[in-house]
């Protein structure tokens, strides 16, 4: 093979490599234009999940329980519920909650609904530019209540992000995950994390009572009220909290009639 032939082959090889590299660069550029946001969101999600593995936890739905019969009630902050346990508890009020303590060892902490943060209203009444961004990001799937906000936030997980997903969905997921990091959980979710969407009451349960752990509840009624409860037992108590106890409480939350206030 002559030197001229070798040079010609080298030039052809170099030209082919240059064309291939150019095509790759074009494909990468097209991908980044079309999927750059999604890819960045996907990478961020993986990074956040590695640092905070609980981000991958989403609530498991609880089935709707049967109706609850009328029974003894507990009252606090102009609301009432059916007492989850028999007996006459000793109320221990504080500025933000009332703790009902039973002689059998159970305690129900009822937090003041009026002291709960109205997150959605804070967003709506905040910086107009930020609210406009919020409206634009969630235009396809509007959030119209605090329950809907928590439902979407707690239901988001990095595993739901894909580099080839819709761009607006990627932006929405990015915001939801940032909020999830900010909101955190009321109790550790490795003991159970559940959601309920029943007539008149909706929300989340942190903890499985069958595991003998405290249970926290964050609930929302159809009138915009927010409720938080903690159910626990003293270390020396042999009495257990059951899911029926929790259901009884949730299904009977209602305002105290004005005549009884």
What are these regions (language model features)?
Residues 78, 105, 125-128, 180, ...:
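Glycine-centered secondary-structure boundary/capping sites
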């Amino acid at each position: 093979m002559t030197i001229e032939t070798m040079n010609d082959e080298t030039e052809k090889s170099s030209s082919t490599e240059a064309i291939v590299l150019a095509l790759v660069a074009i494909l990468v550029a097209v991908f980044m234009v079309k999927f750059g946001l999604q890819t960045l969101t996907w990478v961020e999600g993986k990074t956040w999940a590695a640092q905070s593995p609980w981000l991958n936890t989403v609530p498991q739905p609880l089935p709707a329980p049967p109706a609850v019969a009328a029974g003894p009630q507990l009252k606090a902050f102009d609301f009432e519920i059916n007492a989850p346990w028999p007996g006459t508890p000793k109320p221990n009020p504080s500025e933000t909650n009332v703790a009902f303590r039973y002689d059998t060892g159970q305690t129900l902490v009822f937090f003041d609904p009026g002291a709960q943060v109205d997150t959605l209203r804070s967003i709506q009444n905040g910086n107009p530019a930020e609210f406009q961004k919020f409206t634009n990001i969630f235009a396809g799937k509007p959030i119209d209540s605090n329950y809907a906000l928590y439902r979407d936030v707690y239901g988001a997980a990095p595993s739901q992000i894909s580099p080839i997903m819709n761009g607006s969905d990627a932006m929405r997921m990015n915001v939801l995950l940032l909020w999830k990091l900010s909101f955190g959980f009321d109790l550790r979710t490795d003991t159970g994390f559940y959601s309920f969407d029943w007539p008149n009451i909706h929300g989340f349960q942190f903890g499985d009572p069958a595991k003998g752990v405290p249970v926290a509840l964050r609930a929302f009624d159809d009138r915009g009220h927010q409720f938080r409860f903690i159910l626990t037992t003293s270390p020396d108590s042999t009495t257990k909290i059951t899911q029926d106890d929790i259901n009884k409480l949730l299904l009977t939350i209602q305002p105290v009639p004005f005549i009884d206030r």
